[in-house]
Curated annotation (Swiss-Prot):
One of its GO terms (molecular function) is zinc ion binding. It catalyses: 4-hydroxy-2,5-dimethyl-furan-3(2H)-one + NADP(+) = 4-hydroxy-5-methyl-2-methylenefuran-3(2H)-one + NADPH + H(+). The gene is EO. Optimum pH is 7.0. It comes from Fragaria ananassa. This is 2-methylene-furan-3-one reductase. Coiled coil: none annotated. The lineage of its organism: Eukaryota, Viridiplantae, Streptophyta, Embryophyta, Tracheophyta. Induction: Down-regulated by auxin.
Length: 323
């Protein structure tokens, strides 16, 4: 098992932890001396540089899926970007010193790790990680994995292909901004439409991939005469989404419950998807989208969650630097 010099990897580290379910503002506490996780043969230990927050983090803290959650206490954080400091004996893709990023949890809602990314060190399975694109900062890289992989998997499930049209519900969110970009630049959609609130329409336009920006505060997308081959619902409105799809088209959603024939799915995290998207990220065709308030310092994680929970975020909320 290769490692950095043992004296450089401490036995304890700083982390944010909750030991009971509830609102992050009530239950999330800073702990200066949490045990650094031991790695398995197919894992690496990462010195965390940046982490991003996702709605699944605060929903998990609230106990939304406690029946399938790992036992408390929990260090939250799915998305990580950092440097490999130790590798398990079966790891072949990464070595000590590699800059990596990924979504730590292969199955988001079933036994997610208790050692998330809001800590100085975290353990990750080799299969969920990828090498960080050289042109991206750690902040940018940390913003990507869960959101861009979710966008990609949904478009694959919807069978979006070149020449088809797509409508994105919630185009300015962490996932929505990537659905728009991937639909246009990776899947070759002929037309990309997206909904957002009035103040977030400019963001859709700056992405340069949305052909039609719909202000949902002023018009109902389901009443438009134009229908779409694919509707990707990132907000939880499948009852309306199914009215906007062409006959024989596909509706996918990441927010249940799903009105048939919409397909509800939960992401399976794969480093191979990040590797596949690497050329698009390195060329600048697909760009990370950070909320203007990002990054939040490690001391302000509770405030970062409060902002994310307010639904005001446009793009991703990132925590950096992590000591």
């Amino acid at each position: 098992m290769a490692a950095a010099p043992s004296e450089s990897i401490p036995s304890v580290n700083k982390a944010w932890v909750y030991s009971e379910y509830g609102k992050t503002s009530d239950v999330l506490k800073f702990d200066p001396s949490v045990a650094v996780p031991e790695i398995k043969e197919d894992q690496v230990l990462i010195k965390v540089v940046a982490a991003s927050l996702n709605p699944v983090d605060f929903k998990r803290a609230l106990g939304y899926f406690k029946d399938t959650d790992s036992p408390l206490p929990t260090i939250p954080g799915y998305d990580v970007a950092g440097v490999v400091v130790k590798v398990g004996s079966q790891v072949t893709k990464f070595k000590v010193g590699d800059e990596v990023y990924g979504d730590l949890n292969e199955t988001a809602l079933v036994n997610p790790t208790r050692f998330g990314s809001l800590a100085e060190y975290t353990a990750a399975y080799e299969r969920v990680l990828a090498h960080k694109p050289k042109n991206l900062s750690f902040i940018e890289a940390a913003s990507l994995p869960l959101a861009i992989e979710t966008a990609h998997e949904g478009l694959e499930r919807a069978e979006l292909s070149a020449g088809k049209s797509v409508l994105v519900l919630g185009g300015a969110g962490g996932v929505g901004t990537h659905i728009i970009q991937l639909a246009k630049h990776v899947f070759g959609a002929s037309k990309v439409a997206a909904t957002a609130s009035t103040k977030k329409l400019d963001l859709l336009r700056t992405l340069g991939a949305a052909d039609l920006a719909i202000d949902y505060t002023k018009e109902n997308f389901e009443d438009l005469p134009e229908k779409f081959d694919v509707v990707y619902d990132a907000v939880g409105e499948t009852d309306k989404a199914v009215k906007a799809v062409k006959e024989g088209g596909k509706v996918v959603t990441i927010v249940g419950p799903a009105t048939p024939p919409a397909i509800l799915f939960v992401l399976t995290s794969k480093g191979s998807v990040l590797e596949k998207l690497k050329p698009y990220l390195e060329s600048g065709k697909v760009k990370p989208v950070l909320d203007p308030t990002s990054p939040y310092p490690f001391t302000k994680v509770v405030e970062a969650f409060g902002y994310l929970e307010s639904s005001r975020a446009t793009g991703k909320v990132v925590v950096y630097p992590i000591p």
